[in-house]
C-alpha cells in the first residue's frame, strides 16, 4: 500500500512538472524579471520600472525589476547571459553595455544578447555655465581650436559621458582636457564651482538648471530636437555630427526564441498610443524611442561599432 | 523657529500623512533592528509603492523608513552585538558589552535619546542653514575631499592605539580589500581573478554580516555562553540626566561630524559613526574604557549616524546631489513625479520642501517614543534560548546579504568574512580599523586621483589651497599625537609589568 502511494505521488510529481512545461509553451505564464543594470532610484531604474509596469498591464503577468548595479552593470549582464532563454529573465540597459565591452570591463559582447526593443531615449546635452562667453557650439569649437587642451570637460572615466566627450572631440576636431568629475550631480557642482568649463547633462536636468538661470545648453546630441526642450538646438543643426543618446534597450539572453521576442516587442509597440505611458516617460526626462526587433538589432550593432571606433581612436580599447 | 513650526503644523494637520510617516517609522525601526536589513533596503522596497501616491505622501512613508532605519540599528547592536545596519557598527563596540554587563536598558535608552538628538538637530540645521552649507560645498574640489579623507584615515591610528601593529595591519587589510573591483578612475579591473561578481567589489553589507552576525552567532553557539542576567526595569529616562551634561562636548562634536560627513556626497551614516567613535575615543580621558561598555562610545556613534540624515538631505534638496545611498533613492522617488531637486525646488515646491522638514522632525519624535515604549520588550530578546534565536538570525543574515544586491555571490562573501572575523579574533586583530580602511580607502583613492587629473599631476595644490593645507596639518597633528599616545601607553604597560 505504501509503495503504491509512493509511486502514485511520484507520478503526480512528474505530471506536475510536465504540466509546468506545457504551461511554459504559452508565454508568458509566470513572473518576468527585468534585470536593471543600475541602482534603484536613478533615471535608468525609473525608466525600467515604468516599462515593467506597462508590460505587466499588457502581458497580464507580474513583471518585476531586479537592480544589479554591480560592476557598472557587468553583474546584471552576466546574470542575463547565464539565464535560461525562456523570456523570464530580461536585461534593461543602454549605451553603457557597449562601453563596458570595449573598455574591457566585461568580456562578453552585447551582440551576444538577443535584442528585443528599444524603449525610451534620454537625450544628452553639452552644457556650460551661464557665465561662459560661449553662446553656441561653434563659439566653443572656435575657441577650443585656438586653445587646444585648455578647456576642461567633466566626465566619468569609462562611462557613457566619457564617450560623449570623445564624440565631441572627434566630430569637432578639437582637444579638450577630460577630467573625471563623477556622476551627473557632482559634475553640476564642479561646473558651478568653476572647476569645469563643460559638462554633459541630460535634457531633463539641463532644463531645470537653464530655467534657474545658472546653465547654458550649447547642443543636444541628437538628430532632432527633444520634445521636452524644443528650445535647445541640436549639434547636427549646428553642423556637427554628434549623435549620442542613451537609448534604453531591452535584451533577452542569447538564443531567446523569436516568438517570445515578438510577444514582448508587440506589447511595447502598443504603448505609443498610451498617453499615460508617454507622460510618465516625460516626467523623468525620457522620450518615446521604440524600435522593432529588426531595427533594434541594426541599431545595437551600429552603436556597438561606433563606440568601438571611438575607443580605438582614443586608445581606450582593451 | 517659525519655519519648522509651520512645517510641523502642516504635517500634523494631515492625518493620512501622519499615518504614513508612523507606518514608515515602524517599518524603518524593524528594518534597522534586523541585522542585514537596512534603511536603504527598506526605502528601496517601499519606493515603488510611492509611485502611486502624491510626492508629499510618498515622502512621508520614505522619510519615516529612513529615520526609523538609521535609528533602529542600535537595537540589534546593543542586544546582540550585531549592527542592525552599517550605520551602527561603532555602536556594537560599547553598547553590546554594556548590555552583557546586565544594563541593556541603559544602553538602549542612550541609543534612543542620542538618535533623537541627532535627527532633530540635523533637521534644524537643514531648515536654517542648508543654503549656506551648500554654497561651501561648491567651493570644495577633489583636493579638499582627498585631504579630508586622508585626515579621516589617520583615525585608524587612534582605533589601533592599544595594539599598534595589529591595528594598523587590520587597517591596511581593509584598504587592500577596498581596492577589489573596478578602479575608481581609469576603470581597470583589480584583483577580480576573472570573476565577474568581483568586478562589483566586495559588498560592505555582506562583509559586515559575516564579520559580526555569522561570526558572533557561530562563536557564541560554540562557546555556549550563558544567558546574561538582565535588569529590565526602566526608571525615568533609563540613564542619569547628568550624563548628557558630562557628554555635552562629545555629543556636539559627534553631531558636527555626522552632519558634515552626511553632507559630503557619497558618504553617509555608515562612515559617520566610525569617525565619531574614533574621535570620541581619541579625545576621551579614559580611552582604555572604550570597547568595554563606555557610554561615551554609544553617544558618539548614535548621535553622529542620525545627524548624517539631515546632513545628507542638505545637498539633495538644495543641489540635487544625494549625500548617501538613501537620499539617492529619495531623489528617485521625487524624480518619478517629475520633480527634479535642485536650486528650483525651494521656489517651485515650497509645500513639498516644508513637509519634508516637518516629516523629518516628526519621524524623530515618533522613533523616540516607539523606542521608549519598546524598552521593556526589546531586552527580552536576550532571554530567548539561543537554539531558537540563532537560526532566525542566521536566515535573516542570508536574506540581508542577498537583498542589498539581489546577488547570491554575496553569500560567499559573507561566509568568507565570518571566517576572516574568527581568524582576526584569534590573532587579536581589531575589526574597526579594517572596516574604516575598507570604506575610506576607495574614497581617498578616487578623490586623490581625480585631484591629480585636475592639476595635471602636480601635488602642489594640496599645500597651496588653504582648506586642503589646514586639513593636511590636522592629519599630521593627529598622526603625531597618536604616536605619542601610543608610546605613552606602551611605556605605561611596560611600567605595569615591571
Language model regions located:
Chain A
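Short, low-complexity disordered leader/linker segments with a strong preference
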Residues: 1-29, 318
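Immediate post-signal peptide segment of exported/extracytoplasmic ligand-binding proteins
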Residues: 22-34, 62, 83-89, 141-152, ...
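N-terminal (or domain-start) structured segment
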Residues: 24-112, 150, 157, 161, ...
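Hinge/capping helix and adjacent helix->loop/strand transition within the periplasmic-binding protein
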Residues: 30, 82-88, 101-186, 247-280
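Short coil/turn segments
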Residues: 39-41, 95, 129-134, 155-160, ...
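Beta->alpha turn/N-cap motifs
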Residues: 91-97, 155, 183-184, 201-206, ...
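A ligand-binding cleft/hinge motif common to bilobed small-molecule-binding domains
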Residues: 95-105, 162-171, 197-230, 308
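C-terminal lobe and pocket-closing loops
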Residues: 121, 205-273, 302-305
